[in-house]
Design a protein with these regions (language model features):
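Conserved active-site and cofactor/substrate-binding residues in soluble primary-metabolism enzymes
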Residues: 16, 20, 28, 45, ...
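N-terminal small/polar loop signature for handling phosphorylated ligands or for N-terminal nucleophile
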Residues: 42-115
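Local beta-strand N-terminus motif with an aromatic residue
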Residues: 30-32, 88, 171
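A glycine/threonine-rich phosphate-anchoring loop and its flanking beta-alpha core
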Residues: 112-184, 190-193
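Hydrophobic residues at beta-strand termini and immediately following loops
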Residues: 12-13, 64-67, 164, 176
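An N-terminal, well-structured beta->alpha segment
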Residues: 1-64
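Conserved beta-strand elements of the Class I
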Residues: 34-35, 90-92, 135
């Protein structure tokens, strides 16, 4: 049986890697970032470390923070509408799996508007076009959402989660800078479970 391995375009690792966000944005001729980050990361200044790089390099952005620990259909819908109004042409996902998953869903729907309802992407998604380019900046270790082709969304109404698998949603750039890692208790529990199982 054949195995398929899919890799993102570029990954940067090490202290100071965050500075490469500006270089990559300029190299790709991106005009404005739609920054997806949860309220806690904004509150504790983690998001600002990324936006400081953008500010220093004169790069435009808009922040979207309607992201929950387990992103919902509503979070995605609001994000899609906000992205359309923003005039952005790429996404920067800052955080753990929740920010990454929200960004992937937004990016896929913007690029493939026929799948406006994220529930239609459950399972192996039948999209035709790559999502809006994503630069992923993980702040936790373990989810690997910055280099994988799936995302998980919560359907609050039906009290269930569903997985979308789509090779078109992988971030083009991953920035693994140890200075960005946070040690928040609510994500530490899941990391321990990864280690045990």
């Amino acid at each position: 049986m054949a195995n398929r391995i899919m890799l993102n375009e570029t990954s940067y690792h090490g202290a100071g890697a965050i500075e490469e966000i500006a270089n990559e944005a300029k190299a790709h001729d991106f005009k404005k970032a739609f920054v997806c980050s949860d309220p806690d990361l904004i509150k504790f200044g983690v998001t600002k470390k990324v936006t400081d790089v953008l500010d220093k390099n004169g790069l435009a952005y808009e922040i979207y923070s309607d992201i929950k620990a387990n992103p919902t259909i509503e979070n995605v819908q609001h994000g899609v509408e906000a992205f359309k109004k923003s005039g952005a042409d790429y996404l920067i996902a800052i955080g753990g799996g929740s920010s990454m998953d929200t960004s992937k869903a937004i990016g896929i729907i913007i690029a493939n508007p026929e799948f406006e309802d994220v529930r239609s992407l459950e399972g192996v998604a039948p999209t035709k076009k790559p999502c809006v380019p994503i630069i992923a900046v993980p702040t936790t270790a373990g989810t690997a959402a910055e280099v994988t082709i799936n995302y998980v969304i919560t359907d609050v109404e039906r009290k269930r989660k569903f997985v979308c698998v789509d090779p078109h949603d992988m971030p083009i750039i991953a920035i693994a800078d140890p200075d960005r890692k946070s040690t928040r208790l609510n994500s530490s529990h899941s990391k321990i479970s990864y280690a045990v199982f």
